Amino acid sequence: MTLSFDLTTEGARDALRARAAPEKPSLIGLTRAELGEALVASGIVPERQAKMRAQQLWHWMYVRGVSDFAGMFNISKDLRAELDKHFTVARPEIVEEQISSDGTRKWLFRFPPRGAGRPVEIETVYIPEEGRGTLCISSQVGCTLTCSFCHTGTQKLVRNLTTEEILAQLLTARDRLGDFPDRDTPDGAIVPAEGRKVSNIVMMGMGEPLYNFEAVKKALLIASDGDGLSLSKRRITLSTSGVVPEIFRTGEEIGVMLAISLHATNDDLRDLLVPINKKYPLKELIAACRAYPGLSNAKRITFEYVMLKDVNDSIEDAKGLIKLLKGIPAKINLIPFNPWPGTNYQCSDWETIEKFADYINNAGYASPIRTPRGRDILAACGQLKSESERMRKVDRLALEAMMIAGHGEA
């Protein structure tokens, strides 16, 4: 059974009115140094207190998960009022929450226009498994890559997400799952039996993370900060379709696990499936992978390979894959194609996928077949696409009018 909660009706008018007011800057997504600078620049904290106050706020935002200054009890009431006057730590609007029959959750978040002309929406997916819970995070509204098998690729790029908006997906998911101290897990929620509800994050949602490098870098460094959200970098994976110039920087400056959306073993086919290959062909991509900082058997690169019937699923393709990746510490994730409305592709037969996996395994590579999750709510790999077009026209126009009347499109 699939559950879907439309969260726009309750408080929708309040949300519209709130958007008419000038947008307060968020403290989410600032470094500690930037937090201190913002407090001093606002005139509410003297410079000598900036470092201490920044640390207090950091703890409340990222350890306790507080989304309202009123809940920061070790800060004076007067200072809390001043903070609320100048800044916000609020969560984004949740338009809809869908819960799959397998426990997968998908949220549709709405963010301010920030240059896009109207409010924007993105999707975030939570996948519970035995012993871990993985959050699939988006980095852009839409995508420029137009990978032919991917639903997100049919949505034009609207804009990059900010560091705040990337982190907001993680913070809100932890809110909804009861993953902060003194929070209750929702009744009936499927989550890991022990430990964190969100133990892993993957930058595999909407968009190409390396086309939004600085915001993604900052968000992941905050997410992995040991005095805050404290996610291990070994539990953070960044997936790229092959933006070669930024791959080395990812390892050097962020230090997280790397995944490559490969899907083909020759340039002719990859040009069709993943058009960025025309700019950065396989020879350059594989060379960048071999040079990835820290690459070892303990820090393998994951290569994602979607199984498309009669396209890339032959044993000859498997042989080509082994030859291409020879010498690279790697894991190869085989992804049964997840259908979406309007696609021309079909998923490979299960027997074909198993034979492909057996060949890869016998060649010495771990080759798990990814279990499709959340297909019934279009939350599976390659199915994400924000659905702003579902807003009733009258509501969308009213929302846009109030946004523009309040503070323009910035």
Swiss-Prot record:
Principal location: cytoplasm
Residues noted as binding S-adenosyl-L-methionine in the record, renumbered to the chain: G207, E208, S239, S261, L262, H263, N338
Keywords, ordered alphabetically: 4Fe-4S, Cytoplasm, Disulfide bond, Iron, Iron-sulfur, Metal-binding, Methyltransferase, rRNA processing, S-adenosyl-L-methionine, Transferase, tRNA processing
Gene Ontology terms: cellular component: cytoplasm
Molecular-function annotations in GO: 4 iron, 4 sulfur cluster binding; metal ion binding; rRNA (adenine(2503)-C2-)-methyltransferase activity; rRNA binding; tRNA (adenine(37)-C2)-methyltransferase activity; tRNA binding
EC number of this enzyme: 2.1.1.192
Cysteine-cysteine disulfides: C136-C381
Recorded catalytic activity of this chain's protein: adenosine(2503) in 23S rRNA + 2 reduced [2Fe-2S]-[ferredoxin] + 2 S-adenosyl-L-methionine = 2-methyladenosine(2503) in 23S rRNA + 5'-deoxyadenosine + L-methionine + 2 oxidized [2Fe-2S]-[ferredoxin] + S-adenosyl-L-homocysteine; adenosine(37) in tRNA + 2 reduced [2Fe-2S]-[ferredoxin] + 2 S-adenosyl-L-methionine = 2-methyladenosine(37) in tRNA + 5'-deoxyadenosine + L-methionine + 2 oxidized [2Fe-2S]-[ferredoxin] + S-adenosyl-L-homocysteine
Localization, UniProt: Cytoplasm
CDD domains: Radical_SAM
Further comment found in the protein's record: Reaction proceeds by a ping-pong mechanism involving intermediate methylation of a conserved cysteine residue.
Stated family: Belongs to the radical SAM superfamily. RlmN family.
Protein name, UniProt field: Dual-specificity RNA methyltransferase RlmN
Gene from which the chain derives: rlmN
